[in-house]
C-alpha cells in the first residue's frame, strides 16, 4: 500500500514527538508499505518567524523566512529515520526532485506538479521522501507558499498525483470529534465523516483538515485523521469519505443584471423582501443577489429587460410589508 503521512506542527513539536513520528513511519515501512512524508514546521515556528518580521519585507523574502520552519522539520525527521535504518531523503523547494510548482497567479500549476510528482513516486520502493509541507516554488525557482493549512493541501494533493492508497493526517486530536476536546468535556471521536460535512465544519472554524486540501480528495483516495500519540499510521482516527464536488454553479444562460442604487440600500431592513415582491409581481425569477455598500444587483433569469421604473428604490420601499 502507498501511504502519504502528513505530520502537523504539534506532532513534531519536540524531539520526543519527532521520535514518535519516526517510529510510526519506520513500522509502516517495515510492514512492507511505501511511505512519503509531508512535514509542517515544528510547533509554532511559522507564527514565531512571522512575528519577528518587524519591517516591510517583500513577499519573496517573507516566503524565504517562513520556509525555514519546514526546512528544519524535514531535516530533523529525515535524520531520525536514518538513525532507525530507514533510507530517507528530504525534499524542499530548489531540490531537483521538488514536485510542487505555482503559476503566475500563485496557484498550483496542476499539469506541471502532476508531472513532477511522478519522479519521487517512482522511488518510493527504496526511499522515504520527507517533503516540506506548505511550500512551493514558481517557474523562476523562487519559494512560494500555499497559504494556511498548506501542509494538508500538500499531502492530499500529492496523494492524488502519486496514486496513493491513503493519506494520513497526523494531528493533535483523535480525528474529528463531536466537540472541541479542549472545551467540551466528553467529546467523542466520529469514526466516519463525509467530505461535504467536514468542509462545512472547516468553513465554520473547525481546524481539522484545511478546506483547500479537501478539493484534491477523490473517491479512490482514502484520507484519515489520527492523533500523534496513537503511534499507528494504518488504524484509528476518523475516515473522510466521498469525493470533493465543486460547489460553484456555472451557467451559460444570459442573465439580466439591473442594479438598484441608493445610500446604504443593502443595509435597509426588508429591502430584499420588497425587491422580491416587486419582481414576483412582474413574473420574474431572481437567480442570485449581490450587494455592496450602495448598489444592490439582482441576477434575473428573465431574458427581457425589466422596466427601470419598477426597480426604483421608492417602488421597492412601497412594496415593503
Model-derived regions: residue spans:
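A conserved active-site cap/scaffold subdomain adjacent to cofactor or substrate pockets
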Residues: 199-257
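A conserved regulatory-domain signal marking ACT and ACT-like small-molecule sensing domains
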Residues: 235-321
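Nucleotide/pyrophosphate-binding catalytic subdomain
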Residues: 1-213
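Short, glycine-/Ser/Thr-/acidic-enriched flexible segments
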Residues: 9-10, 42-43, 136, 151, ...
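Structured core elements
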Residues: 4, 11, 36-37, 145, ...
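Structural beta-strand/beta-sheet cores of well-ordered domains, especially the beta-sheet scaffolds
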Residues: 3, 127, 165-166, 199, ...
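Flexible, glycine/charged-enriched surface loops at secondary-structure junctions
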Residues: 34-37, 209-210, 221-231, 282-292, ...
